[in-house]
Design a protein with these regions (language model features):
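N-terminal, polar/charged subdomain of small-to-medium soluble alpha/beta proteins
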Residues: 1-94, 102, 106-112, 116-150
């Protein structure tokens, strides 16, 4: 049975706990995960903190649509998407995407697809705190190019 967990909130998550839930199903031979973290630098500047904002309700709906599209393309078991919001510090986790499937090819492709679409289609906004002041982070052309290959 296919199961999906989508969580958006300020709470930190534990990668091991998320992996354990994904890996419970014996019918899935592949578990692929990605964890994104706050870097201490961006665009040549030091980053002291990162604040993520979102559009409540719309963000979760967008993430559910991305997962549904992935399920339409690949045979998937469990899928987890966790995205933090609020203020975070370098080294803290921002995002977790976990995908299971019977085979690794589907799991790798679906995980990459979900992450590429999340970066370009989900309504999140990033603001970095640097020694020079706060600034909004613009979307990157490389993220758009990655999503366009799907």
């Amino acid at each position: 049975m296919a199961e999906t967990r989508i969580l958006v909130g300020p709470e930190r998550f534990t990668v091991g706990t998320e992996y354990d839930w994904l890996a419970e199903r014996d019918e899935d031979g592949a578990v692929v995960t990605f964890t994104g973290k706050v870097r201490n630098h961006n665009l040549g500047d030091s980053v002291k903190a990162l604040t993520l904002e979102h559009y409540p309700g719309m963000t979760e709906k967008s993430l559910a649509a991305i997962v549904a599209e992935a399920r339409g393309r690949w045979p998937l078991g469990r899928v987890t998407v966790i995205h933090r919001i609020g203020e975070m510090w370098p080294g803290e986790e921002i995002v977790f995407v976990g995908v299971t499937s019977a085979h690794r090819g589907s799991a790798f492709a679906a995980g990459e697809f979900i992450m590429d679409y999340l970066k370009t289609k989900a309504p999140f906004w990033k603001r970095e705190a640097t020694p020079e002041g706060d600034r909004w982070v613009e979307s990157r052309d490389s993220d758009k190019q990655a999503a366009s290959r799907w």
